[in-house]
Amino acid sequence: MSYSERIRALREDCDKTQSDIAKLLKVGQRTYCDYELGKTRIPVDSLIVLAKLYNVSMDYICDLTDIKGRFPGK
């Protein structure tokens, strides 16, 4: 699963809209949609915000692990 698919799945699991997350990241809804479609790379600082919001690790978002916890391996 790509990071774009992962951030979409996480958003949907939390019953949030693209507009909700776009406001949090201070970007337009279209920009956030492009992140989820993989058309635009999401900035690292935005990934950090999402990892904190969803209480998951950056490794999970980037599909380096399937463990949802904040600190896999601990």
Tell where the protein language model's regions lie, with residue ranges.
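Recognition helix of helix-turn-helix/homeodomain-like DNA-binding domains
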Residues: 26-41
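DNA major-groove recognition helix of helix-turn-helix/homeodomain DNA-binding modules
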Residues: 26, 45-60
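Conserved hydrophobic/aromatic packing and binding residues within compact polymer-binding modules
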Residues: 7, 21-22, 32-35, 61
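Conserved amphipathic alpha-helical interaction elements at protein-protein interfaces in regulatory
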Residues: 9, 13, 53-56, 67
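Short, charged recognition helix plus adjacent turn
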Residues: 34, 62-74
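Short basic helix-loop element that most often maps to the first helix and adjoining turn
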Residues: 5-24, 49
